[in-house]
Amino acid sequence: MSPLQEIGTAVRMTAIFWIGCGLAYPLIFTGFAQVAFPDQANGSLVRNAQNQVIGSSLIGQKFTSERYFHGRPSSIDYKAEASGASQLAPTNKVLIERVKADAAAFEAQNGTKPTIDLVTTPGSGLDPHITPAGAAVQTARVSRARNLAPEQVRKLVSQYTEGRFLGIFGEPRVNVLALNLALDGIRR
């Protein structure tokens, strides 16, 4: 085979793989995802009554009002395009001081110690969930701020607690955005 034939073969194979792997494969699977899982394929967006996007059920948001449950802290300030952890070791003084400060602020606002998930950042920096225990320690503050009976708020937390995936994987969790939207929907 001459060098020119080898170059021709290489160019043809490159074109075939580029079309197959670079165009056909992504288009087929994107199309499949749009048909089979349209909500997830489009980011699991959450919309309000006016059909405006107010968040995603997969990305945490910062809630600071006493009327809302607060999620996990984010090392990236909840910026989805910058997903990632702080990469600080557990013995890092900066991390230790931040956790202590967050715990003190939480205790001052809630009158109780936080659960570990409320003062540690997730690996992605975007976790939309907290533990049921993390929600429970915020229940008194939220019910007081909204003038709701604590039992009513606890019931809502229980209602929005998701179980383990397939009953065995992961831990029970509460989606903070979904819970806060449900709180906003309560009529007094």
UniProtKB/Swiss-Prot annotation:
Cellular localization per UniProt: Cell inner membrane
Domain of life (superkingdom): Bacteria
Keywords per UniProt: ATP-binding, Cell inner membrane, Cell membrane, Ion transport, Membrane, Nucleotide-binding, Potassium, Potassium transport, Transmembrane, Transmembrane helix, Transport
Biological process, per Gene Ontology: potassium ion transmembrane transport
One GO cellular component term noted in the UniProt record for this chain: plasma membrane
A Pfam family hit: KdpC
Segments crossing the lipid bilayer: 13-33
Biological function: Part of the high-affinity ATP-driven potassium transport (or Kdp) system, which catalyzes the hydrolysis of ATP coupled with the electrogenic transport of potassium into the cytoplasm. This subunit acts as a catalytic chaperone that increases the ATP-binding affinity of the ATP-hydrolyzing subunit KdpB by the formation of a transient KdpB/KdpC/ATP ternary complex.
Known partners and oligomeric status: The system is composed of three essential subunits: KdpA, KdpB and KdpC.
Protein name: Potassium-transporting ATPase KdpC subunit
Species of the source: Gloeobacter violaceus (strain ATCC 29082 / PCC 7421)
Gene name for this UniProt entry: kdpC
